[in-house]
UniProtKB/Swiss-Prot annotation:
It is an enzyme of class 3 (hydrolase). This is Endoribonuclease SymE. One of its GO terms (biological process) is RNA metabolic process. Belongs to the SymE family. The lineage of its organism: Bacteria, Pseudomonadati, Pseudomonadota, Gammaproteobacteria, Enterobacterales. Keywords: Cytoplasm, DNA-binding, Endonuclease, Hydrolase, Nuclease, RNA-binding. Involved in the degradation and recycling of damaged RNA. It is itself a target for degradation by the ATP-dependent protease Lon. Pfam families: SymE_toxin. Transmembrane segments: none annotated. GO terms for cellular component: cytoplasm. Its EC number is 3.1.-.-. Disulfide bonds: none annotated. It is found in: Cytoplasm.
Amino acid sequence: MTDTHSIAQPFEAEVSPANNRQLTVSYASRYPDYSRIPAITLKGQWLEAAGFATGTAVVVKVMEGCIVLTAQPAAAEESELMQSLRQVCKLSARKQKQVQDFIGVITGKQKVA
């Protein structure tokens, strides 16, 4: 019970009990000695609903008695211009100069020779 000087504030749980999952730590066999090592397997449609689609990078934080999995946002796709720039950087110095000259011509900063 609360004492006379405190006010009970209702709160909503951060994680709904309906979203809780229970599992048991199993084991995986390790070659060549076939020793048993602890293993946890997570699978189900709920993973995608929680932001863990196939191919998602995951950061794992481990503490005593607690494991936190955090989905990492997908890296923004590189623009077509940046991809082209990376290709130009791999060219010889002569070809890089030709690309620079071409850019100068189409921007009007350089006259056609």
